[in-house]
């Protein structure tokens, strides 16, 4: 039903999608899994299931992004810092295919999230729609206990969301960074592969992600310095406690 632990994670991400600079950081991370009738927390994220059927379920989708100082980002030198952001909203999950033993499935994920800055007076910075296909494979052939996740999808943001990252107000324009007003709409594609395994005393997981901004409504922004890039992360978590009750997890 639940597991509790702690660990460490290392990440390598661009400062924002389209940045040509990488932000590498190591963080202590809590490890918590729970599978109740309503609330669930695991390698798929934190979510609450409001509606659940054999093929369709409705849950809560959450996302976080770290802050970025303009002193460290050449493209944004002299511009306001990028605050950490928090996103929350509903997500519909549609199971398109599932193996008889429920160890493999293909789902269509449809999250729509409102985004806010994380500061003393949070700002509404629009919304993000990120439909994607998710293939999960439990117990890889020849690798018992290892789980593989594959995701592929597109990203859309409204005008306020895209402007937060890609607009350049006239007062911040320079000879090499002209003023620019970002529009809402298509914001590129995203592909992710993740692998994980739960050992008796610890959990190990890693992922790699590829983003491509070609064709995005803001691709001509002077703040878009790189239209495609890779990001990656690795996490090791030690399990410190677990419930005596065990439940079957199908998703």
Language-model features: locations:
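Short loop/turn motifs that connect adjacent beta-strands in outer-membrane beta-barrel proteins
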Residues: 1-3, 17-18, 37-56, 97-106, ...
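Residues that define the transmembrane beta-barrel architecture of outer-membrane proteins
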Residues: 2, 22-28, 54-56, 82-88, ...
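Transmembrane beta-strands of outer-membrane beta-barrel proteins
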Residues: 2-6, 28, 39-41, 56-60, ...
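Residues on the lipid-exposed face of transmembrane beta-strands in outer-membrane beta-barrel proteins
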Residues: 8-12, 30-34, 45-50, 88-96, ...
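Sequence/structural signature of outer-membrane beta-barrel proteins
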Residues: 11-17, 65-71, 95-99, 113-120, ...
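Extracellular loop and loop/strand-boundary signature of outer-membrane beta-barrel proteins
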Residues: 14-16, 46, 75-79, 115-122, ...
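Outer-membrane beta-barrel transmembrane domain signature
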Residues: 94, 120-203, 211-216
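Predominantly the C-terminal beta-signal and adjacent terminal strand-loop region
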Residues: 191-251
